[in-house]
Amino acid sequence: MQYYRWAVSTFSFLFIFSITALSNANAATLTGKVAFQGTAPPAQIIKADADPRCKLMHPNGIAADEVIVNPNGTLKNVFVYVKEGLAGKTFEAPKATVVFDQKGCQYSPKVFGIQVNQPLEIVNSDDTLHNVHALPANSQPFNLGMPIKGMKIKRTFTKPEVMVKIKCEVHPWMRAYAGVLDHPFFAVTGGDGTFEIKDIPPGQYVLEAWHEKYGTTTQAVTVTADNQEIQFQFKA
């Protein structure tokens, strides 16, 4: 699958989602997509020559991943979540572990969501030194050197924050972002630009879409048992 990257400040994309009621306790599922409008420029290539093992895996360089436009005209790596409307509600941290890997001299996933106090397992799948330097403002920062292939370390974030930047000083092209929330209502757009957020109770909410390059956009929405479609549009 071929991706395109955007490297300038002008942009245009369309954020669309619909609300479909579930029969289970009146909860709803949010589905939608983030679409890019305009002509995508050629990809930028980053040389990996400084690390021989990275160069071996990427002899022609690594494609920059700050902005990825999918073949169907949608945007990848947009974090979508409920920003307002859950006051007074509490949600237990999941026991399921979120895995954050260093593979092919890149972070995977690039953008992810995790709940407060949910286990985060950090893995090095490469036979080279990486470090994971997380820079939260609300939780304790950490900087982990991981020189051994197969090495695993667990950490947690203790306070909500959108977004937490993660970087590797050894390989400066490696950047990732974690959306840390005290609820489970979030998703990240993938290779088709779509997202799905399940089991949202009826009510009035503010949803936010975050992108590494383009920042944030929000819109108020009323979740009911009726199907709905809402659009966010950005133009250069």
What residues fall within each predicted segment?
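N-terminal secretory signal peptides that target proteins for export/translocation
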Residues: 1-8
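Extracytoplasmic copper-binding redox domains, predominantly the cupredoxin/blue-copper superfamily
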Residues: 22-236
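Short, intrinsically disordered, low-complexity terminal segments
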Residues: 4, 18, 22-25
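Bacterial N-terminal signal peptides
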Residues: 9-21
